[in-house]
From Swiss-Prot:
Organism: Methanocaldococcus jannaschii (strain ATCC 43067 / DSM 2661 / JAL-1 / JCM 10045 / NBRC 100440)
Residues noted as binding [4Fe-4S] cluster in the record, renumbered to the chain: 33, 36, 39, 43, 73, 76, 79, 83, 117, 120, 123, 127, 156, 159, 162, 166, 196, 199, 202, 206, 244, 247, 250, 254, 276, 279, 282, 286, 313, 316, 319, 323
Molecular function, one GO term: metal ion binding
InterPro entries linked: 4Fe4S_Fe-S-bd, 4Fe4S_Fe_S_CS, MvhB-like, Polyferredoxin, Polyferredoxin-like_ET
Positions of the 4Fe-4S ferredoxin-type domain: 24-53, 64-93, 108-137, 147-176, 187-216, 235-264, 267-296, 304-333
Alphabetical keyword list: 4Fe-4S, Iron, Iron-sulfur, Metal-binding, Repeat
Pfam families: Fer4 (PF00037), Fer4_7 (PF12838)
Cofactor note: Binds 8 [4Fe-4S] clusters.
Swiss-Prot/TrEMBL cofactor(s): [4Fe-4S] cluster
Domain of life: Archaea
Annotated protein name in UniProt: Polyferredoxin protein FwdF
Lineage: Archaea, Methanobacteriati, Methanobacteriota, Methanomada group, Methanococci
Signal peptide: none
Amino acid sequence: MIEQIKEVYENGFTIYRDGEVEKRELCWNDELCVGCGICADICPVNAIAMGPLGAIAKGDIIAPKLDIDKDVCVLCGMCASACPFDALDLKINGKSIKEDERYPKIKRDIKVYQDKCVLCEQCEMVCPQGAIVVERELAEREKFVIGEININKEKCVLCGICAEYCPADAINLKYNYPTPSNPKPITDIEVDKDKCVFCKVCEFVCPHDAIEVICYKCPMMKRIPQAKLYEDITGKTVIDKDACVTCGWCAFICPAEAIEVEKPFKGELIIDVNACNACGACISICPCSALEFPKPKDKAEKVPRIIVNQNLCVLCGACAKACPVNAIKVKRTEINFEREPKAIAWKEAFKKLMG
């Protein structure tokens, strides 16, 4: 029997068997692993053991999320085929089974329709994995805003009202610590013309008519169709598909419906609120930020200890594995296959993930 060797690295490990006909390598990447335990559920020889996920997620201990017994593992590749986050991969003679038509593959995907995208950056702000970057290039400011602003310092009494009301934070006051020889708390006023949008708010609020604003091209002063404002704004939304967990936060929040997400499973997450002890392990481990402690509107309102937004859940099961009181159940009703299993043994193995 050919010996299987396990090499451990800082962010994972590789188990490999080097035979005369073929070389098999099973690689695990800790950075991509979310601790869902799907690999352990599907393993036909029970070679995979999950770590203390709740404690790991909450930062109580530092340990691997899983381990594989190299002497038990048969390098069949079921775990790699079922892993929805590509944390496991089996290579046969250097080729990944994810690229091999003979092996099943779970599908998850995300698409950005750049022609719809308005480059608002909201998707980037909400992504729990930091997998989205909006590359936005603005035209030179002078193409949008042209004008002049003048402050008559003989009329100005340095009251600061203009600075308080300026929506662009373009007016700066120079403050002074009052002394008997120099008692004025404000000694000067300046306009940052790189920030000023010539909206005339300062002119309107000045009680001494000390400010004059001349606007040649000012979007804030009149209604301009959105397309006009965007004429000179270019860019694109970039998704790091290795980091993306297809939670759907981006599509959920997108005001332009420019993002489409395909999740690996359909079903629902069921929480036994009576069993839940509100430890927070599920919240800490969830790669999708789909769980939260609800906040009551007032002291009298009763709320569940924990709630889930089903729209943001990928049904990976990491929360269920981390829960110390077994208060969470994953009910999967459908697997989104890119390639369905053909062999009977593989079909039966994938059935373990259902229900």
